Amino acid sequence: MNLQHHFLIAMPALQDPIFRRSVVYICEHNEDGAMGIIINKPLENLQIEGILEKLKITPEPRDPAIRLDKAVMLGGPLAEDRGFILHTPPSRFSSSIRISDNTVITTSRDVLETLGTPEQPSEVLVALGYSSWDKGQLEQELMDNAWLTAPADLNILFKTPIADRWRDAAKLIGIDILTMPGVAGHA
C-alpha cells in the first residue's frame, strides 16, 4: 500500500492538538516511512505576503490578479521554521520533487521569488513544518483507526475553503464525517 498523493483524514476520535480534524497530504510513502503536509491548519496571522516580507522578497513584476493574502498552513510538528510549498507543475525550481503528475513540493527560495508574479505556478499552498511517520508507524495508526485515506483531490488541496477540507476530503470516500461518533455537537 503506497499512500503517496493521498489524503490522511483524521478520525473524529483523534484528539492530538495538531492532528485533530486534520487533512494531511502525503508527499512520500515508502518502506522507510511517510512524510506529509497538513493542508487545513492555518497559522494564526500569517499569510504568504508576510512570509515574503520577512524574507525580503518583492514580487517583480507584480501580477495584481494573484492573491498573496492566502493563509500559510502549519504543515506539521517537525521543522516548523522550514517552508514547504506544494504547487502544480512545472518543477523547474532548484529543490523540487514531483509527487504526482499534478503536484510538486519545493523547499527552495526560488519558488517563493515567483509568488505574486506571472511566473508563479498556477496553484500554490505554503506551509511551515511537516509531518512524518517512521517505518511501520503510519500503517499501525491506520490499523488503529486513527485515519481514513482517500486519493488526493487537487480541488480540495488548493481551492476548497480551509474550514471545509476535513469534511470534503471524507466525502471523497462517501463518508459524512460530521455525523460520525466522536464529533462533538453532532448527532
Swiss-Prot record:
Record family assignment: Belongs to the UPF0301 (AlgH) family.
InterPro entries: AlgH-like
Full protein name: UPF0301 protein CKO_04323
Cited Pfam families: DUF179
Family annotation (SUPFAM superfamilies): VC0467-like
Cellular component per GO, a single term: cytosol
Signal peptide: none
Organismal lineage: Bacteria, Pseudomonadati, Pseudomonadota, Gammaproteobacteria, Enterobacterales
